C-alpha cells in the first residue's frame, strides 16, 4: 500500500487517537494561549463525536506556572521548576475544563510518573482507569507529575510519555502537534531552504543529529525527541502524524485528507505490547556487550543471549533489571531483562553452560536474557 493510501486509511479508521501538544504550541511569553486551547478542545471534541476515542497529552504546566509567578518569584533549579508546575498545572487544567465544557465534553486530569508505568500492577491499574474514562466519553488530559517526579523516574519529556501511553490505552494513531510545519529534510536553523518531508519510511535511516535542532526554549524536547517517540510508536505498529500545531483547524484539516505535516510509517514487524512494556518501562541500568556471533544469533536467528556471547559488562544492576545489549562496535541492538546481576555476569561472561554451573552452582539460568524478555532494535 502506498503511504498516501495508508495515511488516509489510518486517519479514517483509527479507534483511539493519542494527541500530544507541546509548550511551544500552547504558551506564549505571557502565559497560556487560551485561543489555542479552545481550538484544540473544539477539534478533539469533533474527533470524539466522529466515533474515535481521544487522549490528550499536554505540556504547559511549568510555563503556565512561570507566567503566574513572574512578578513575585525567581524560578531557578529543579525544586523551583517542580513548584512552578504545581502552580501552573491547576491553571492549565482549569482552562481545559472550561474549553471542553463549551463543546459539551468532560475532561479528566491524569498525572503520571515513569514509576506508574514500569510497575506492572500500577500499569494495569492505569490502563483500567483510562478504559473507564474512555468508556464514559471523557477526554483524559495527561501530563507528567513534575511536582513529585525525581530525575530517575522522569519520562524525560512528554513525547516519551505519549509513546508509552500508546501501550496503556491501546492507541492506534499518534498525532504530535509541534511548533514546526513538520519534519524538515535538513536542519532549518542552518539550512533555510530545507523542505518538509511528507513521509518517513523508517526513522532509523535518518541522521537525526544533522536534521534536528536543539531543544525549544519553553519545552524539554525538540524534533529529535519527537522522532524518537515516533520510532517507538512504529515498533508497536502505530503510525505518527507530526503536525504544525499553531495552524488553524490543523487536526480537522488533517483528518479531512489535507496533506499537511509529516507521516511516519509503522514498522512491518510489530512487537507485542508486553515486550514494548518490558523495553520501555524504565531506563536501562547497564550495558552488556556481546561478540559478533552472539549479535548475529540475536538479530538474525531470534535467539536468547547466552553467557558465552558476553564479552563486557558495564553499570551496576540486580537480577531482573533492564539492560542494553550492544554489539562489538558499541551499537545498541536490543534491550532486555537480565537474569543476572552485574557481579555474577562479570564472573560468567564468555563461559559455556557447564562452566557457569561450576562457577555459580546449580541455581543459575541458561540464558543471560531470554528472547521472550528482549526487544531488538529498541530505541533507548
UniProtKB/Swiss-Prot annotation:
It is found in: Cytoplasm. InterPro entries: AceGlu_kinase-like_sf, Asp/Glu/Uridylate_kinase, G5K_ProB, Glu/AcGlu_kinase, Glu_5kinase, Glu_5kinase/COase_Synthase, Glutamate_5-kinase_CS, PUA. Its EC number is 2.7.2.11. Pathway: Amino-acid biosynthesis; L-proline biosynthesis; L-glutamate 5-semialdehyde from L-glutamate: step 1/2. It catalyses: L-glutamate + ATP = L-glutamyl 5-phosphate + ADP. ATP binds at residues 20, 220-226. It is an enzyme of class 2 (transferase). The keyword Kinase applies. PROSITE patterns: GLUTAMATE_5_KINASE, PUA. The keyword Nucleotide-binding applies. Residues 285-363 form the PUA domain. It comes from the Bacteria. Its main location: cytoplasm. One of its GO terms (molecular function) is RNA binding. Keywords: Amino-acid biosynthesis, ATP-binding, Cytoplasm, Kinase, Nucleotide-binding, Proline biosynthesis, Transferase. One of its GO terms (cellular component) is cytosol. Belongs to the glutamate 5-kinase family. Catalyzes the transfer of a phosphate group to glutamate to form L-glutamate 5-phosphate. This is Glutamate 5-kinase. It comes from Nitratidesulfovibrio vulgaris (strain ATCC 29579 / DSM 644 / CCUG 34227 / NCIMB 8303 / VKM B-1760 / Hildenborough).
